[in-house]
């Protein structure tokens, strides 16, 4: 435990700390897998068990898949609209996670989920819209902060944690539905997603980034074209100019 704490505190930003960047990327992917597993497994099983027509379930599946089909649209958007002083990707990740929480919480106010399946489908579409935005933003963050020799390991770890989140959301939470109800299971996910959101809220991407608007920058923001040495290994960082790093998100 002491070793983990030491690794976490070794360097203030993701660029400076390998342990922080790997853990952060994996936890953010867990946040995507949790509601995805719930939606595609537990929620669909609940609908089927309560007599929802197959055609309504098919429409639900098709609708929530749309944001993922066209998520390539997010790439140019998050590259174009940036607030460098807070990190290039961090504001987008926080925005996406906030949208995921709000859209999921809104379902709690639907009086009868079975009777209002069309409304729930719209809300889950919005939820997946924000989830796909987080997916693209986290992948972009990985490209920015990972070093070339970390990419394969990070990609595998991120894929595994997302699938782990899907197992928790689908199987574990699904087993709670018969005893506690579907809305109780949704309520469990909301604080979990909020807790995960605290991670990027208090982490800097690069030295000099501000966490909040009222905070003074610790130092001048490092420009991407500058060659910077990793304090841990003395190797060039993956976000320097003209890097040939390639990353594929899970």
Regions found by a protein language model. Give the residues of each.
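Transmembrane alpha-helix termini and helix-breaking/packing motifs in multi-pass membrane transporters
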Residues: 76-81, 108-112, 168-187
């Amino acid at each position: 435990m002491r070793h983990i704490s030491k690794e976490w505190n070794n360097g203030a930003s993701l660029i400076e700390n390998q342990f922080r960047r790997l853990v952060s990327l994996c936890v953010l992917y867990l946040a995507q897998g949790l509601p995805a597993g719930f939606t595609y497994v537990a929620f669909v099983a609940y609908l089927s068990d309560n007599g929802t027509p197959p055609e309504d379930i098919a429409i639900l599946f098709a609708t929530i898949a749309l944001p993922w089909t066209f998520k390539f649209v997010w790439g140019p958007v998050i590259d174009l609209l940036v607030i460098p002083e807070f990190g290039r990707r961090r504001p987008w990740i926080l925005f996406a996670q906030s949208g995921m929480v709000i859209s999921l919480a809104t379902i709690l106010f639907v009086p009868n989920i079975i009777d209002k399946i069309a409304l729930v489908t719209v809300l889950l579409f919005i939820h997946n819209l924000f989830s796909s935005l987080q997916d693209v933003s986290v992948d972009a963050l990985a490209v920015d902060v990972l070093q070339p020799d970390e990419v394969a390991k990070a990609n595998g770890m991120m894929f595994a944690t997302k699938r782990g989140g899907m197992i928790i959301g689908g199987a574990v939470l699904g087993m709670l539905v018969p005893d506690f109800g579907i809305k109780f299971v949704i309520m469990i996910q909301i604080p979990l997603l909020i807790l995960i959101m605290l991670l990027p809220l208090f982490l800097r991407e690069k030295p000099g980034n501000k966490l909040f608007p009222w905070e003074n920058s610790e130092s001048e923001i490092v420009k991407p074209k500058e060659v910077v040495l990793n304090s841990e290994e003395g190797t060039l960082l993956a976000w320097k100019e003209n890097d040939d790093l390639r990353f594929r998100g899970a």
